[in-house]
């Protein structure tokens, strides 16, 4: 309405690059890529955490930011309520003839939305990421199509707004669920991001909520 962008789409690789770069600048951070949380013992003054490579560390607070299947949440004995919608999302990237002008587009019809998110050009052609939602059986059938049939189905579902679509990536499928933890904290533990709550992707608010969780935790 104001003419200003409603939001910005940032690729995961860019976010990871910038976060890793920032982490490298922080003297109080011990970054251990490839090492995960195994278990913890909560005490009055500390938590003893055992990592997947066998080492133990003593910390004042364990922050569970380890996703919807959070091991930290389970170790803190925090229950979770999950709602399943019987839908899945099919994700992939396409090239097309018409430029996307850096605008995301959603095409709605029965079964679920078909969302095109602008990406940088691929081999000189306009490129978009796609999130295609439908019931689980339909998505499984689409994921199994041969390339030509899949491109034709994606083009038809898009309404042809960018012209013929050509898939240029692997196809991934994701279950559509919502999830909420029964508590956001436990003994010497706190939950953020998808360890605490999961939303369907249609609102595109998962990252924003995760960042808000971190801001809230810092303010406590």
Predicted regions and their residues:
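Conserved FAD-binding catalytic core of PHBH/FMO-like flavoproteins
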Residues: 46-56, 61-171, 176
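Short, solvent-exposed loop/helix junctions and linker helices
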Residues: 8-13, 144, 208-211
């Amino acid at each position: 309405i104001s003419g200003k962008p409603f939001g910005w789409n940032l690729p995961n690789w860019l976010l990871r690059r910038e976060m890793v770069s920032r982490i490298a600048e922080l003297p109080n951070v011990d970054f251990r890529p490839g090492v995960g949380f195994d278990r913890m013992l909560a005490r009055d003054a500390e938590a003893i955490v055992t990592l997947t490579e066998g080492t133990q560390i003593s910390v004042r607070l364990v922050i569970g930011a380890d996703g919807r299947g959070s091991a930290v949440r389970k170790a803190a004995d925090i229950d979770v309520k999950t709602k399943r919608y019987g839908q899945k999302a099919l994700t992939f990237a396409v090239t097309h003839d018409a430029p996307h002008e850096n605008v995301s587009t959603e095409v709605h019809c029965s079964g679920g939305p078909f969302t095109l998110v602008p990406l940088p050009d691929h081999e000189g052609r306009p490129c978009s990421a796609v999130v295609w939602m439908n019931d689980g059986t339909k998505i499984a059938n689409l994921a199994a199509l041969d390339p030509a049939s899949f491109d034709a189905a994606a083009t038809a579902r898009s309404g042809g707004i960018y012209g013929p679509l050509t898939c240029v990536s692997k196809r991934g499928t994701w279950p559509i669920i919502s999830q909420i933890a029964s508590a956001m904290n436990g003994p010497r533990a706190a939950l953020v991001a998808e360890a605490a709550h999961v939303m369907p992707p249609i609102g595109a608010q998962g990252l924003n909520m995760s960042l808000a969780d971190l801001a809230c935790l810092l303010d406590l």
